[in-house]
Amino acid sequence: MIATINGDTKINGKGHPTEVRIPDMFGSIMSATPMVNPHHFKVKAAADAFIADYLKMDKHEATKNRKADFCFCASAMAPHADAEALRTMVDWLNWIFYFDDDFDEGQLDRDPVAAEKEIRHTLAVLEEGAEIPDRELHPLRYLFRTIWDRVKERAYPDVQTQFKITHKRYLDGLLHQVEATRDGNGQPRTEEDYIRMRRRTVGGYPCISLIAYAHNVDLSQEAFEHPSVQECIAVGCDLAWIHNDIVSYKKDVKSGIEHNFITVLKKNGFTTQQAMDRAGELQDECYRRWYLALASMPIWGESIDREVLRYIEACHSFPLGDLLWSFQTGRYLGATEGYKLHETRVLDLSDLEPIAV
């Protein structure tokens, strides 16, 4: 027996939802016509082959990585990058996803001591005169070092500084996540606590700085630190994690990952549909925050303002590219299910274990 609640959620006879209606994630600033980097196919083949060989992936893992298509993600985020910069972005996306998985569902997700050690060593890579990591013992750390070397060759000095600052924000957020997981003892986190943490762990802060590198943006440190610019960065990060937590909800439930906004709200008494609706409310708040930040942006003068505009474009293309990729990648849905979800805004939950309404 299947029943309909409020015209948008179906449940089975035992009271468990089999589908849920998601927010419209392609409205307002996310309705922009997408662009994809013309170097996508050329760079993808080389980058996929490299990472499979470098991380010694078996055939199954290599196929899984290829279907994830991190090159499409980079191509949508940095459509104007040349082939060299696009390749650096793809390598970075491979690095951050494999690095992040260790903190989400790997050996570091509940071990703050080991997590802090790994974060400390990773941050040390960015220091002047740092020792080169051992490629065989620490392949991800070594890969991060090669990415940093490539960024230093081309990025303006202030953008290099921003690269370091934003990576520290991300890594500090991961450590906070590990500590929260360890100390949670099954107790639900508040919405506010989760948002503060998730804004940093989604990876948007460093990714936006990498887009700035890829597009050869020369943003001054003064402009970077202005509250209006920082708010645009925060909005880009918030849109990305809200959309990611919606699209990845099924994957996270199946994997036992609790770092998901929908799951957090459900532990606080929300139904699945109510949690999705609340995510939509936060998304719409982001759109208002975006325009308020632009309205309060100072006028520095032609040369600085031009770079600020290009940087703000990166703050926008990050969540937009991530959203486009999320609906297509095999990591979450795959192109067929992603297309159907985009058209219907109905997420099928019938293949999940029973979830309390």
Swiss-Prot record:
Listed GO molecular functions? Answer: metal ion binding; terpene synthase activity
Q: Give me the residues that bind substrate, please.
A: 198, 251, 331-332
Reactions that this protein is recorded to catalyse: (2E,6E)-farnesyl diphosphate = (+)-eremophilene + diphosphate
Question: Per the UniProt entry, what is one GO biological process?
Answer: terpenoid biosynthetic process
Q: Which cofactors does this protein require? A: Mg(2+)
**Binding, Mg(2+) 1:** 100, 105
What EC identifiers does the entry list?
A: 4.2.3.164
Residues involved in Mg(2+) 3 binding: 244, 248, 252
Per the entry, the cofactor note is: Binds 3 Mg(2+) ions per subunit.
Per the record, the pathway is: Secondary metabolite biosynthesis; terpenoid biosynthesis
One of its Pfam families is Terpene_syn_C_2
- EC class of this enzyme? lyase
Motif annotated as DDXXE motif, chain positions: 100-105
Record's keyword terms, sorted: Lyase, Magnesium, Metal-binding
InterPro entries associated with the record: Isoprenoid_synthase_dom_sf (IPR008949), Terpene_cyclase-like_2 (IPR034686)
Residues reported to bind Mg(2+) 2: 105
* Role, per record: Catalyzes the conversion of (2E,6E)-farnesyl diphosphate (FPP) to yield the bicyclic sesquiterpene eremophilene via a 1,10-cyclization, which requires the abstraction of the pyrophosphate from FPP to yield the (E,E)-germacradienyl cation. The only accepted substrate is farnesyl diphosphate (FPP).
Domain annotation text?
The Asp-Asp-Xaa-Xaa-Glu (DDXXE) motif is important for the catalytic activity, presumably through binding to Mg(2+).
Q: Which family does it belong to?
A: Belongs to the terpene synthase family.
Name of the protein: (+)-eremophilene synthase
Q: Which organism is it from?
A: Gibberella fujikuroi (strain CBS 195.34 / IMI 58289 / NRRL A-6831)
Underlying gene = STC3
